[in-house]
Amino acid sequence: MANSTGKAPPDERRKGLAFLDELRQFHHSRGSPFKKIPAVGGKELDLHGLYTRVTTLGGFAKVSEKNQWGEIVEEFNFPRSCSNAAFALKQYYLRYLEKYEKVHHFGEDDDEVPPGNPKPQLPIGAIPSSYNYQQHSVSDYLRQSYGLSMDFNSPNDYNKLVLSLLSGLPNEVDFAINVCTLLSNESKHVMQLEKDPKIITLLLANAGVFDDTLGSFSSVFGEEWREKTDRDFVKFWKDIVDDNEVRDLISDRNKAHEDTPGEWIWESLFHPPRKLGINDIEGQRVLQIAVILRNLSFEESNVKLLAANRTCLRFLLLSAHSHFISLRQLGLDTLGNIAAELLLDPVDFRTTHLMFHTVTKCLMSRDRFLKMRGMEILGNLCKAEDNGVLICEYVDQDSYREIICHLTLPDVLLVTSTLEVLYMLTEMGDVACTKIAKVEKSIDVLVCLVSMDAQMFGPDALAAVKLIEHPSSSHQVLSEIRPQAIEQVQTQTHIASGPASRAVVAQHAAPPPGIVEIDSEKFACQWLNAHFEVNPDCSVSRAEMYSEYLSTCSKLARGGILTSTGFYKCLRTVFPNHTVKRVEDSTSSGQAHIHVIGVKRRALPLPIQMYYQQQPISTPVVRVDAVADLSPTPSPAGIPHGPQAAGNHFQRTPVTNQSSNLTATQMSFPVQGIHTVAQTVSRIPPNPSVHTHQQQNSPVTVIQNKAPIPCEVVKATVIQNSVPQTAVPVSISVGGAPAQNSVGQNHSAGPQPVTVVNSQTLLHHPSVMPQPSPLHTVVPGQVPSGTPVTVIQQTVPQSRMFGRVQSIPACTSTVSQGQQLITTSPQPMHTSSQQTAAGSQPQDTVIIAPPQYVTTSASNIVSATSVQNFQVATGQVVTIAGVPSPQPSRVGFQNIAPKPLPSQQVSPSVVQQPIQQPQQPAQQSVVIVSQPAQQGQAYAPAIHQIVLANPAALPAGQTVQLTGQPNITPSSSPSPVPPTNNQVPTAMSSSSTLQSQGPPPTVSQMLSVKRQQQQQHSPAAPAQQVQVQVQQPQQVQVQVQPQQPSAGVGQPAPNESSLIKQLLLPKRGPSTPGGKLILPAPQIPPPNNARAPSPQVVYQVANNQAAGFGVQGQTPAQQLLVGQQNVQLVQSAMPPAGGVQTVPISNLQILPGPLISNSPATIFQGTSGNQVTITVVPNTSFATATVSQGNAAQLIAPAGLSMSGAQASAGLQVQTLPAGQSACTTAPLPFKGDKIICQKEEEAKEATGLHVHERKIEVMENPSCRRGTTNTSNGDTSESELQVGSLLNGRKYSDSSLPPSNSGKLQSETSQCSLISNGPSLELGENGAPGKQNSEPVDMQDVKGDLKKALVNGICDFDKGDGSHLSKNIPNHKTSNHVGNGEISPVEPQGTSGATQQDTAKGDQLERVSNGPVLTLGGSPSTSSMQEAPSVATPPLSGTDLPNGPLASSLNSDVPQQRPSVVVSPHSTAPVIQGHQVIAVPHSGPRVTPSALSSDARSTNGTAECKTVKRPAEDNDRDTVPGIPNKVGVRIVTISDPNNAGCSATMVAVPAGADPSTVAKVAIESAAQQKQQHPPTYMQSVAPQNTPMPPSPAVQVQGQPSSSQPSPVSASSQHADPVRKPGQNFMCLWQSCKKWFQTPSQVFYHAATEHGGKDVYPGQCLWEGCEPFQRQRFSFITHLQDKHCSKDALLAGLKQDEPGQVANQKSSTKQPTVGGTGSAPRAQKAIASHPSAALMALRRGSRNLVFRDFTDEKEGPITKHIRLTAALILKNIGKYSECGRRLLKRHENNLSVLAISNMEASSTLAKCLYELNFTVQSKEQEKDSEML
């Protein structure tokens, strides 16, 4: 067929092919398929053309009828020779196209029977019998090709309804309304009005309410149909609506003016009232429509359309005002439902006016239903903000009054409805709140409802209420999240190690105020990141992930828990590339689980940040942002703020603002085991005092992780790995603050953040964990203002953490500040077994950078910059692998080479020690820490020597070598440092395991703490501290400098890890006041050249108990304890060969002194014999001494160094110096020494933490013996090895100042020693002779009067005699008052000389508290230590470091006799070994050696059982000590453990800023541990009174008759107890009360009313043994109930009090007042408490409080709802209404009680109380600003 269609051939061909395909498909479906196209005349037949032609002619039938086939043949151009062409076409059409035509053209049903029963196909059967509608449909293809519209109007069912309603046909309308009624019911197919909103209009039109607009149906429905249907809806509405205002809504415009008033009147008279009911046609139809609208109003999608339809609103208003009851109810219900979406028009609109009219009418009604609906409508209207202005203006006061009146009715529903509307109204702002407050008694009623119980409504009332629980996806937001303890999620569940579990427990310290739970999404993302990691080959069940998340949230009591949907969204966020697949689970009957592909569970979960802290504006917020790249390890999700594994109680510490001088440093703690820590805000409360060395030691801040930290906050961060056997290399980044040039404030010089990561493996001693207290270590030197040290303790199972030291760029050398990096594990414990097993255990040795690295780095670093920063040498990380030792726990430190501090930095310190500086102007200390070469050693040189040599002192080429390897020694880079100040970089030592005991970290911590303390303690101290590190060298150098040139260091035994352990162990906490880092001496001694001539103290740590001190083959040159500024060079009575005194130290407590010696050549080294030569310069408080003396060379043993003479190995020996020198150096306090000597036993004890208790404090009663005698490590041995008086911090105590105690001056060195740790150095001159050493002239003059006082940490130590004055007689609390700052360290009579000093030194160390160590110098212990006599070295102390306060627990170590003499070393912050009580006990006896014992403290448990040993009246000594200066920075807190009834309180020196509660926890734990190991000994008599140091007020020592001034406290202990009647078993232990009662509750009532009344409460708790902490009264009441008035606590207090009373009676007569020479004692500085401390205390106690009235029974849902809503209303009123606040003030007391209850509404009430105060203050501020 030629172009028959006129279409182009290609198009035609395409259509033809498409037709053929369709035709084939058609036949195939019918069972008559064809393959070949028929051919006619030799050509294929065009079936498409044939079909088209036939259908155009009318189809097969028409063509056949008209016989038109011949015509068609012609059109196909068949050859004429084909005679039968027409017939053939017809047959082919029949065969192929007829059926197709029949179905597709005519639309007939295909009635063809299935193939197999073919019907005879007759032409007649093809005649169509139906019409084919398909012929009219145009295919989309054609429609598109012809440009026709493709938008179809798809009719839906709603159109049918609309058309039915429009039709007006009665049946259709009824049908449509019935359908609408059914669809409106709640079901799967709720009517959706948006599909055709006209339905509403038509439904309303059928009820006689018409739209006002044109085109409404009023004419049709209202008029035309009324005639046809006899339905008059207008009349209906007029009949049932009586309110004339509402009748206007009835639309009857036409009839309105026709009717006259007369007709209405007649009609009302004669027309019967409408009979409403089922027979009322109009009424029923209106009711039907009202039901439909009400049902639709419950669907959110329909509410907006209904609320926006003004016709609907008119209908509802008419219904609400009708007297057709059912209709009115439906109308009000619907109005209430749509009110929330109803936007009111301006009030001049009729509908808006009528809305308020309706609400008012309902409220004033007498009908309960109407009242409730009226309040519901009003409350919902409040939800739209735009309605607020209208509501506030047009809801009158009468309505408010009516609403409030509902609250007084005993109707649950009415009360709840009323509260709901009041809450919504109060959200509107001050207008509504003021109107509510103006209603009489409204506030009173609401306050009553806050504590109302729904049961008061009676059982019937509640029965009528049906409770429907709606599961909420998120938790109630109304209740404030009460911060639970900030717990680290112990994700490391697989680590079942004790330490880890313990950590969790310990973590429950209440979070600081301002800590807020992080939002749910962030937490979920962190949790996912912490528990899972990307791994394309693994998959995890998604359901399991979510269930684990829910479990974690449940354990943490988190407020917001994500739904599964929200959780999976977080999953997609954290792991964007994961996929999901279904996995059949064969175990669960083939049920499929959804698995997340590409994610696997972490073997070691990361820490999670649960809270963030809103930093007070005042403090520089130190935000540690996670620095992901810090460590090779993935960034940790977040290191928890709180102590992690180590249950450390971190005190929130104010971070001082040192920002001015500091440059930001990065502190990164990359730890392998830890992923980069998510950034967290370090919780460092701002420290108000910046640059105030006095500031309390900042509590340790936990920095979540590496982030640049402003140097301003100097932090020593200790990351402690409490992981059994894991060595965690730590990265340390130390940022030296830029040198602070301020000359005046040395302490401020560059407080640098020091991050010390101490990785410490807890070797199977979870108990050590408690030690975390050391974590508080602050680097005193660093930040005068009291830099918090952050300690991050993480338990990592055997994972190695790589330590990296990051050089802190330009931060001043950390050391310069005298900051001590303390790598102190909070856990001091190392067991002897550990030592023994050290090889097997993770190596104790911390491997510092491999030696090769070390050497190069050191030189490079040192030379590289003048800044003394620890630099990571070459940034190399030493891998543990570097150490052959198998012990996995090795920690590798990168080489730390302190760089010389630029002179500018040093300047502050220099200024402080101008005198010294000249000598050591070039001094620069370089600490090189390198791995010992002998990696193979089990105890690979666990101890690295830290030699801080001032370049000046050392030969230029000499480097102090910390490395265990000798190679390192050569590094001369330090010499370049000389130009820098004497800043000594802090060396960090970490033993791999840190001896697996906390000790090394502890040491470091102690050091840092001491320093900080120094800074804090005395103004001079800051300089000293600064100097301590940097200047220390100066001071030390000054003192030692002459000798420094050759500070030879004996070689410590390289392998002796136990020595290292010992060294480390003693440092329980940041005990070293000046503590520099103590690096355990490497096995290889530094080259001799490194030695400076300065005296060296060699601590010999022997694993053995052997008392012998090996002189490490060191030159006689005395080693200084460089750690502290005041270096006491005490000539040893028996200088070890080589002239270096080696003090065997079981527990090298010396560490407390800045272990890093600042003296030019001082080197700590441990000989293979476990000897460690340590130069300790007491940094801590010695700054003061330095200041005062300028360069006094006093070696004051940092308290941390407790070497008890008794412990031969532990003894600290100071080489004899010329007398003059010794005098200078004598300032050191005696070490009270724990006998931490090398006894294995002790070591074991220490490891276990028992050592404190076990150590016995021996006081040599023979002063004479003392000299020659050294206490062996046991302290029992009265070996004279310690011949030289134990040096406090390397100074002998045997200076002349001591002589009185020494029957003869033990050592010729009668030169006065000023015991100064952190405090102005005071010389203890014999007989009060000014003991200024040559180098101590500056302070000494001031101190002259005070010479007798030993200043420790700025605290005067009592000289021997004076020390004795402090007697245990003083009640603990008194003691705490006296020693309150922990600054007084009575020094035992020097007669006890070296031994005593050693003991005291140890004690000092132990006792040293980060904030200020108290040096309790038990004269006796110090004396005894040197003596053979059973001198009780107070070795036990050495182990304890109390981060928060010095604990001088000279606990009996090995020494059999536990002498009470306890030295609280001013510096030592040694955390108290568990149970150790470090008591600063002045020895009651005169300094005389024998008397030294007088105050023996049996402080095993921290209880001071000290018997006061009456010392021979060594009153000269007393005279020498005019008084004990009070250190502002420290207070001694007596902590009693209510659980240990047998233990007396532990005295702890607490830094001023520290939270005593934290200290108390640590101390109690320590005491508990000790107690387990040893019977408690009581040292009650630690009552040295701290008097302001400057005035050097006399210290009262109770029990010392010689005391010139009676200690104020002493009286109380001496009071006769009130008469005790039968049955009275509980005594009030309030100061001077002692009344007996029958029950604990009576004691509590008595104490709360008699001692805690408004008029009598003194501002702090004076309970015996309680710290003098300023408390708000409510906080005190809570504290009293929790801590003192429980049955256990009272019994424990009685047990402690009994021995105390006896001791007090003995010593009361002996308590002389020390030193009238000092000016009147300055009032002890009030401990600065956090502004929210009271609230925190209430929070902590609230869990224990019992409010029987409303918490005995669990709150029911109704009760909870009423209380919570009432509380929210009160909160809003307090927030917005001034009038309301005035009225609320009356109820503040009641609300306060409720706010600390367990009610659901308690947190809301707390917010209400907050609004009462905060809003007033803010308004006052606004007024002030406006005035300005």
UniProtKB/Swiss-Prot annotation:
Compositional bias segments (type: Low complexity): 1012-1028, 1453-1462, 1594-1614
GO molecular function, one term: DNA binding
Pfam families registered for this protein in UniProt: ARID, RFX_DNA_binding
Subcellular location(s) of the protein: Nucleus
Record motif LXXLL, residues: 313-317
Description of how the protein assembles with itself and partners: Component of the SWI/SNF-B (PBAF) chromatin remodeling complex, at least composed of SMARCA4/BRG1, SMARCB1/BAF47/SNF5, ACTL6A/BAF53A or ACTL6B/BAF53B, SMARCE1/BAF57, SMARCD1/BAF60A, SMARCD2/BAF60B, perhaps SMARCD3/BAF60C, SMARCC1/BAF155, SMARCC2/BAF170, PBRM1/BAF180, ARID2/BAF200 and actin. Interacts with SRF. Forms complexes with SRF and SRF cofactors MYOCD, NKX2-5 and SRFBP1.
Annotated protein name in UniProt: AT-rich interactive domain-containing protein 2
Organism: Mus musculus (Mouse)
Lineage: Eukaryota, Metazoa, Chordata, Craniata, Vertebrata
